[in-house]
Every structure is written in structure tokens, then in C-alpha cells.
Amino acid sequence: MGAARLLPNLTLCLQLLILCCQTQGENHPSPNFNQYVRDQGAMTDQLSRRQIREYQLYSRTSGKHVQVTGRRISATAEDGNKFAKLIVETDTFGSRVRIKGAESEKYICMNKRGKLIGKPSGKSKDCVFTEIVLENNYTAFQNARHEGWFMAFTRQGRPRQASRSRQNQREAHFIKRLYQGQLPFPNHAEKQKQFEFVGSAPTRRTKRTRRPQPLT
């Protein structure tokens, strides 16, 4: 009889315990993984090993390549120009990078007025850009400190005011190209120069003598 009386009480306690656990689970929502990725992508990664890539950036508007000649940044370099070779370092495990000129060793940065300048150190947030791959296969670079400000150049290859640049504008579109070094012909004059053939006296072709066939 005692066991029969305890059974309903145990069942009730078990039901109350299950209900309590369900209530606590509803009060604590599941973690948002996408938000976590966005938060971590906005922070500089000091633990992981940085990836380094080398390439050129072809400007859609100027038809030339981005070059870093010191403090000056422009998009007027020809393919293979030594100042057009860029070293791109990853800043986070996301798509944020730092861009440095291989020859000048200056980082592409953006000041508070939205002007592109070269700096010897790229540690500040002004020198960090977010790569955005567009639907037309071009790439845009948004400054990490000034959200909505993009790296952009005019048709003449001069930097455009970043506050007036937008992601969908041609001035902010770039194509990554492998750097293959200086071209075999450094200037147009030598490219047009014809090859010279080395002169030599003509050789006379001798007649081939045949051996007499043995008589059978």
C-alpha cells in the first residue's frame, strides 16, 4: 500500500521537474552564430597567422593599376610597374585586409577627410579595408573606420573623395591581377624597334655525290 501511495507523488514530481526545465530553456534563447561571426570579423585577429598575398589592383575607371609611390596613391600605373605590386595582409579571419606597396613599403590609408594617403605603419584602423565581392565580379574596398567610404579613383587615376563614393559606382570597382614583373620592353620606343638580323656570307650548297652501284 505504501508503494502504491508514493507512485502518484513521484509521477507528479517528475512532471514538475520536466516543466521547470522547459521553462528555463525558453528563457534562454539559442546563441546567434551569425552575430558572433560579425562581431569577431570586426576585431583584429592577434592569434591566427596572417595570410599574405601579392597582386595588382586594376581600376575600372582609369584602366590602369593602383600604385603607391610614397604618400601619394593613384591609379595610373601600367601593368608590371614596380609601384603597382601590392602586398595584401589579412587583418581578421573575415575579409578585412591591409594593403601595402611592395616597392615603397607604405600602407594605403584613409584620413578623416576621406583622402587616400600612404603611411609607413598600417596598425591604425584607417589602414584597414573590407573586401566586398560584387555581383559583377569586381571587388570594392570599404574603409573599416569610416563605414560607407570606399577606395575610388577618377578616370584620370586621381583618388576620389571617399565621402562621395558608393559601392555601386564604377570608380570603386577593381579587379585583382597577378603581378608578373616588368614587361620585356620597358618603353614604347624600344617596343617599336625592329629586330636586327646578323649578316653573314651566303653558303653554297654542295652537290651530293652518290656511290657507284656494284655490277651484278
Swiss-Prot record:
Tissue specificity note: Preferentially expressed in the embryonic brain.
Main location: secreted
Disease: Hypogonadotropic hypogonadism 20 with or without anosmia: A disorder characterized by absent or incomplete sexual maturation by the age of 18 years, in conjunction with low levels of circulating gonadotropins and testosterone and no other abnormalities of the hypothalamic-pituitary axis. In some cases, it is associated with non-reproductive phenotypes, such as anosmia, cleft palate, and sensorineural hearing loss. Anosmia or hyposmia is related to the absence or hypoplasia of the olfactory bulbs and tracts.
Annotated protein name in UniProt: Fibroblast growth factor 17
Protein source organism: Homo sapiens (Human)
Any one cellular-component term (Gene Ontology): extracellular space
Cited function: Plays an important role in the regulation of embryonic development and as signaling molecule in the induction and patterning of the embryonic brain. Required for normal brain development.
Extent of the signal sequence: 1-22
Classification of source organism: Eukaryota, Metazoa, Chordata, Craniata, Vertebrata
Subunit structure: Interacts with FGFR3 and FGFR4.
Chain segments carrying region Disordered: 190-216
GO molecular function, a single term: growth factor activity
